[in-house]
Regions:
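Active-site-adjacent structural elements that line small-molecule/cofactor binding pockets in enzymes
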Residues: 1-337
């Protein structure tokens, strides 16, 4: 298994003066400790139903991270494509690819928070179709000159975006999530989402998906690829999963959870009850968290992307000791690949 971490781009109160230096030190520390990648989240507005905080703009942040690292992949999980204009996005992606030496991963999705779509003149009901158009147009702009595109939402004539040729892998998010009143989506893998995932280079399972739901989604992905005459192995397809975690060194689950509740509810909204958090996120003692990681590997996850909930390098070192070191190179079951 590969392990990446999210840069601490949360806009926490009182952190304005130190934030840039925190991100720099965190990125450099993650590289030194051997993490495979640095990821960022995209929310144009504060999605108050799920989170207490907003985040820095992701692509600008990754350009900053590119300047202070040399090895880790740099990715989005996810970039909300319906809020992006494809010509501008192509220029941003091409620039990050140039500045990072080709380390960018475009983790993409439709988003879910309706005020964000409305703020840019869109609507939630258009998000799937807009996502497909943005992906198609952006990838064409990254590979060809003098591009003309006629879509329902985006159109341009004879556009050339340079530098050309630095096309990143595209990992598409979506699928089932916990069946609960606090979840923003239904617990299904929609056929349109399934087809979108299988068109590209990888899949990011929802952070709110339990291991059995990841397993079920992946079986559908495998079947869809087989119907198309291919497989994950043939495509070099990546199975990733995003999750939230605070590692506690306290003895006993109750003590560990008490610490985690305080830390997690500084970032995520308590509109989701703790039983929801425990059902989908990595909580409990270090041994509990390790069992949760193994359950996700057993479900087919190859690349785990973890939010550390903090810029504190001590958490990053705990992640390296208790997750990166014991699970690096651990593969999903052979019958799942």
């Amino acid at each position: 298994m590969k392990l990446g971490v999210f840069l601490p781009t949360y806009l926490l109160p009182g952190g304005e003066r130190e934030h840039a230096d925190q991100i720099r030190r965190f990125a450099a520390g993650a590289e030194e400790l051997g993490f495979e990648s640095l990821f960022v989240t995209d929310h144009l507005l504060t999605a108050t139903r799920f989170y207490r905080v907003s985040w820095l703009e992701p692509l600008t942040t990754l350009a900053y991270a590119a300047a202070v690292t040399t090895r880790p992949q740099l990715g989005t999980s996810i970039l909300v494509l319906p809020t992006r204009q494809p010509v501008v996005l192509a220029k941003e992606v091409a620039t990050i690819q140039r500045l990072s030496g080709g380390r960018f991963v475009l983790g993409a999705g439709v988003g879910w928070y309706e005020p964000e779509f409305e703020a840019v003149g869109g609507h939630r009901t258009e998000r799937g179709r807009r996502t497909d158009e943005v992906l198609d147009a952006t990838m064409e702009l990254l590979t060809e000159a003098d591009v003309t595109f006629e879509g329902r939402f985006y159109s341009f004539d004879g556009a050339t975006v340079e530098p050309l040729g630095a096309v990143p892998p595209v990992w598409v998010a979506g699928g089932r999530q916990l069946a609960h009143a606090a979840s923003p989506e239904r617990p299904v893998m929609a056929p349109t989402v399934l087809r979108r995932i299988c068109r590209w280079n990888g899949w990011i399972a929802r952070p709110t998906a339990a291991p059995d739901q990841i397993d079920e989604d992946l079986r559908e992905i495998d079947a869809e690829l087989e119907r198309g005459g291919t497989s994950r192995a043939e495509r070099g397809f990546t199975v990733a999963h995003e999750n939230f975690c605070w590692l506690s060194e306290r003895a006993g689950r109750d003590a560990a959870v008490a610490e985690q509740r305080e830390r997690m509810f500084a970032v995520v909204s308590d509109e989701r009850p703790w039983e929801y958090i425990e059902a989908v996120y990595l909580t409990g003692t270090i041994e509990d968290v390790q069992r949760g990681v193994q359950a996700r590997i057993d479900a087919g996850v190859e690349y785990l992307l973890l939010h550390t909930m903090t810029a504190d390098l001590r958490q990053l070192k705990l992640f390296a000791k208790h997750v990166l070191e014991p699970f690096a190179g651990v593969a999903p079951q052979l019958n799942r690949v």
